[in-house]
UniProtKB/Swiss-Prot annotation:
Record gene name: proS
Oligomer status and interactors: Homodimer.
Domain notes from UniProt: Consists of three domains: the N-terminal catalytic domain, the editing domain and the C-terminal anticodon-binding domain.
A Gene Ontology BP annotation from the UniProt entry: prolyl-tRNA aminoacylation
Name used for this protein in its record: Proline--tRNA ligase
Organism of this sequence: Bacillus cereus (strain G9842)
Upper classification of the organism: Bacteria, Bacillati, Bacillota, Bacilli, Bacillales
Family annotation (Pfam families): HGTP_anticodon, tRNA-synt_2b, tRNA_edit
Amino acid sequence: MKQSMVFSPTLREVPADAEIKSHQLLLRAGFMRQNASGIYSFLPFGLKVLHKVERIVREEMERAGAVELLMPAMQAAELWQESGRWYSYGSELMRMKDRNAREFALGATHEEVITDLVRDEIKSYKKLPLTLYQIQTKFRDEQRPRFGLLRGREFLMKDAYSFHATQESLDEVYDRLYKAYSNIFARCGLNFRAVIADSGAMGGKDTHEFMVLSDVGEDTIAYSDTSDYAANIEMAPVVATYTKSDEAEMALEKVATPDQKAIEEVSAFLNIEADKCIKSMVFKVDEKLVVVLVRGDHEVNDVKVKNVYGASVVELASHEEVKELLNCEVGSLGPIGVTGDIEIIADHAVASIVNGCSGANEEGFHYVNVNPERDFKVSQYTDLRFIQEGDQSPDGNGTILFARGIEVGHVFKLGTRYSEAMNATFLDENGKTQPLIMGCYGIGVSRTVAAIAEQFNDENGLVWPKAVAPFHVHVIPVNMKSDAQREMGENIYNSLQEKGYEVLLDDRAERAGVKFADADLFGLPVRVTVGKKADEGIVEVKVRATGESEEVKVEELQTYIANILK
């Protein structure tokens, strides 16, 4: 492709609203442009990268036995109402009405549509297992779109769905697609980890996320320093043991703590360590209010609270709800005196506290010498806190460290969550009606492009891995007015294309500095510069990833490039 014919508008300045490298560079290099908040156009170079990621996804999915189809973006509300997600999914679901006032959603995901499709066609175990996938635009009304393609309102996604007669069949296909995902992200050149995850609104049981390691990632990965254990911090269980001290229990006492609300303030004011304080929080669990206790130096993990109750929705109670429940402000909450049908659950660490402190449910006061079970009753002690760096790894090997990650893939064992809700059944080998067992497997295709750009860049621009680069080679005649340089550039361009390389020829009448700056910004794997030594049959070859350059004779160029790109 000749650069003079390409639509690739570059920017010299960093756009003001672009916070992270991938967003900045994809805009500056002319790979995409924003149409509205969280909505982007892919320009020609960006689209070439997107198509290469798509191709890798298709190859690995088909190798794993999945078959491609395409489902509609507009989905009837009746299907979501049938599954129970029309109201539970939340405000991220984009809803609309047609001219006849019939309700629809723009697809955020396609479990309902695929289940409806398959239940009408698959009636016997003899047609199972079946794995179908699509690459389709998805829509989510993000409250705060940010980071370019990493959190948009419209994005390209590969979603696959598998259907089974037995759990063993699901396990087999799940493992196969897990490996396919690992292959996809490895082929894209990414540094990633597969981690244990929470299924969230999708439902189901076993689930893993594929996380690209990056400091700008919105998720925290907890991993062992000596083993392969890795989990989203939401899902990492705490296996610590707590020993109760043998100090004598002292008399409960209420003390004034004016304007002291945060644990750090209270512990400093009372000269009590944070690990002897009891942090009290009120959660709304499927409309039921629950008091949750953790140690002062720990944080409540709301996903674990949700899992204790098997709840659909867990959120912090509002200030108004807390005031009505306990007649106090949030900063003065405590478990003592909580009565009626309000349940108190606590993290294991709370049980070991002796002579601790807690809020007194009265503004400006706290209790000291608080002892669980003597001063208040707990209905259940369980794991309710976030794991911390330095904690023992849940697999018993090593200690936990943290890293940030960008989620690019997610695989779920859905089980019968959707098939039972939507009456998707088949006849088993004994002629009995059974619900279809399902799996679900998603990859953010456009998000993967951004994740690659986030991992592969330097101070001068993008540095694309060869598997996804828009072109393999960038040929730059420095002076297009020079017949020797122009003709040699054309000859190299044509000969490399004949060998199957994708080549970009910079045939613009621009200054050398502009051409080189754009070349660094585009980030193609190999740059061939045709300069003053063209008359001698010599060009300069530069490897973008390493910055290494070498003069090469034209007759040796193809072999030299082949060794770089092998």
